[in-house]
C-alpha cells in the first residue's frame, strides 16, 4: 500500500491489498470507502466458498493525484482512477475511469468530463 502526500481520509476506510494499492497525492477519500485489489475464489468444487483460494493475480488499484472519492464507494481490482476525477457517493468502480471525469453508479460510469478549452464540466 502506497499513500501519497496531502491525502485526506475520513472515517472507516478499508483497504484489502494482496498486490498493490497506490493512492496519489492530494486525494480526498470520504467516509466508508472500501478498496480491494484481489478476488476471492468461487469454485463450487470445494467444501465451501471459504476454502477457495484468493485470486491475487487480478491486479492492483491506482488512484491518481487529486482524485475525490465520495462516501460509501467500493473500488474493485485492476482499475485506475485518473487524475482529478470524482467518484460519486455509493458508486462501485469495476473498470478504470479516465482523468478529469465524474463517474457515478453501480457499476460506475462516466457522466461528465472536464473541457479545458471551455473551462467547464461537460455532460457525456
Where are these regions (language model features)?
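C-terminal/domain-terminus segments
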Residues: 78-109, 116, 120-122
